[in-house]
């Protein structure tokens, strides 16, 4: 029997899985390109200010990505709850949950940002930033931190749109914001025309202005056009109930996502032991990675709504099929990406620096690290699938194991015995081991759900 859904909501329970994945992933690719080119464009323009400025912006990446990861995690919780209600044919509860989730995301963003801002100097000092580097770092982060609340709200709102099967609108929104950022960057960094020359601060202001415009548009869209967020605050009982469900998934998911920048911070500290030029090279490599794993990241946003709606409708066969199809495709795709990066490594390195040591280190990064991107894809898609199945603790355990049992420890051991080469190779080995563990974990989870479903029938 067909499941009835409102006209603005895509039915992901009956649409062919491959068709759903293609329809939802293609727009996400555009959105992801623009999202991650925010930092890449900033890095490129800032590189013209000199190696010191490039090194400073490289230090900010783990911290800025921590806030972004929290936003993504809360968005995962939002998407899982809303999509499950839609799959169970309860659109009213989906709207109530979406409304509550927006308020909670704003409140949590304010708390996390205030905490990070308060301990900013201590955080960057622990990462290995010198007193000299702290000057440009403060210039950038004192503007970026208060404005970052906007991106958390944008991420949550976009997740609600994806939960109803709409990945096109979030992609257009992020593409527009990315374009605005790219236009404003040279104007505010270098003071072109009537604009003031703000240097590092100009890059931060460009990003904040782009986010503000995107936030205003998205808020109007969710309330008045899509009508997935209510204009009035829900009752206390609804607020508590919906909030608990979202936070039960959102907090572990945010925690799991925040492992990534935390690990990146540790990896940056290890890179700092090789010298400032290596930090600059590692920072460039860290910004290339999201572009190289673009399809993985796009599918990590398009796959969960498909899984959540089918999980809510107890279509476990479709959940399993969607996961396996995604994994097979990602492994083949990332192999192609590796060869493209390998062949163009010299050209890519020369774009970001004219320092021979920095160029050599960027090339070494590109020759080794992308070998693990397909395996990293298995880990990311497994985590997003487990969250979509309302198993956030399993996803959190996998993230902890990946970063603090395999990825960072093996990279550190490699750096001790084989220098920079061992540092990169150790990280790839960590991804290999965790890719195997992640795949087995999903198989066990779906097998358990199938057994429970059969016993309940």
Name every feature range the model reports, one short phrase each:
Residues 1-25, 82-149, 195-251, 307-372, ...:
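Short alpha-helical transmembrane segments in multi-pass integral membrane proteins
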Residues 14, 18-37, 41, 63-70, ...:
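Residue-level signal for short hydrophobic patches within transmembrane helices
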Residues 23-39, 143, 177, 210-214, ...:
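Transmembrane helical elements of multi-pass membrane transporters/channels
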Residues 33, 37-55, 124-131, 187-198, ...:
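Helix-terminus/linker motif at the lipid-water interface of multi-pass membrane proteins
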Residues 54-114, 151-170, 268, 281-339, ...:
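Small-residue-rich hydrophobic transmembrane alpha-helices
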Residues 66-69, 181-186, 215-219, 291-294, ...:
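Hydrophobic transmembrane alpha-helices of multi-pass small-molecule transporters
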Residues 75, 144-162, 170-178, 203-218, ...:
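Short runs within selected transmembrane alpha-helices of multi-pass transporters and secretion channels
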Residues 116, 159, 185, 189, ...:
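Structural signal for membrane-spanning alpha-helices in multi-pass inner-membrane proteins
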């Amino acid at each position: 029997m067909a499941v009835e859904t409102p006209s603005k909501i895509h039915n992901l329970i009956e649409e062919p899985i491959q068709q759903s994945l293609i329809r939802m992933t293609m727009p996400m690719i555009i959105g992801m390109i623009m999202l991650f080119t925010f930092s890449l464009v900033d890095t490129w323009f800032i590189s013209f200010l000199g190696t010191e400025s490039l090194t400073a912006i490289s230090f900010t990446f783990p911290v800025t990505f921590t806030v972004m990861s929290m936003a993504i995690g809360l968005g995962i919780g939002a998407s899982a709850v809303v999509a499950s209600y839609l799959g169970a044919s309860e659109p009213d509860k989906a709207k109530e949950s979406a409304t509550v989730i927006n308020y909670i995301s704003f409140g949590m963003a304010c708390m996390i940002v205030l905490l990070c801002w308060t301990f900013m100097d201590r955080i960057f000092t622990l990462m290995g930033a010198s007193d000299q580097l702290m000057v440009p770092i403060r210039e950038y982060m004192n503007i970026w931190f208060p404005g970052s609340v906007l991106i958390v709200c944008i991420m949550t709102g976009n997740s609600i749109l994806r939960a109803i099967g709409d990945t096109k609108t979030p992609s257009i929104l992020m593409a527009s914001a990315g374009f605005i950022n790219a236009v404003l960057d040279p104007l505010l960094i270098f003071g072109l025309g009537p604009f003031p020359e703000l240097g590092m601060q100009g890059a931060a202001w460009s990003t904040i202005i782009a986010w503000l415009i995107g936030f205003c548009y998205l808020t109007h869209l969710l309330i008045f056009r899509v009508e997935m967020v209510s204009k009035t605050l829900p009752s206390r009982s609804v607020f508590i109930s919906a909030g608990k469900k979202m936070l039960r998934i959102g907090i572990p998911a945010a925690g799991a996502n925040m492992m990534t920048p935390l690990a990146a911070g540790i990896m940056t500290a290890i890179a700092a032991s090789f010298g400032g030029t290596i930090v600059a090279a590692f920072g460039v490599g860290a910004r290339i990675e999201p572009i190289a794993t673009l399809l993985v990241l796009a599918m990590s946003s398009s796959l969960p709504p498909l899984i959540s709606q089918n999980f809510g409708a107890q279509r476990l066969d479709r959940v399993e099929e969607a996961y396996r199809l995604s994994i097979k495709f990602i492994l083949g795709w990332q192999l192609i990406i590796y060869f493209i990066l390998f062949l163009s490594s010299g050209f890519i390195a020369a774009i970001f620096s004219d320092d021979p040591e920095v160029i050599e280190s960027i090339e070494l990064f590109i020759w080794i690290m992308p070998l693990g991107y397909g395996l990293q894809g298995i880990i990311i898609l497994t985590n997003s699938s487990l969250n979509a199945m309302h198993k956030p603790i399993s996803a959190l355990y996998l993230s902890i194991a990946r970063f603090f049992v395999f990825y960072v420890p093996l990279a550190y051991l490699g750096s001790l015995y084989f220098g920079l080469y061992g540092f990169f190779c150790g990280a790839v080995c960590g991804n290999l081991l965790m890719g195997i563990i992640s795949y087995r974990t999903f198989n066990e989870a779906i097998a358990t759900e199938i057994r429970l479903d059969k016993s309940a029938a």
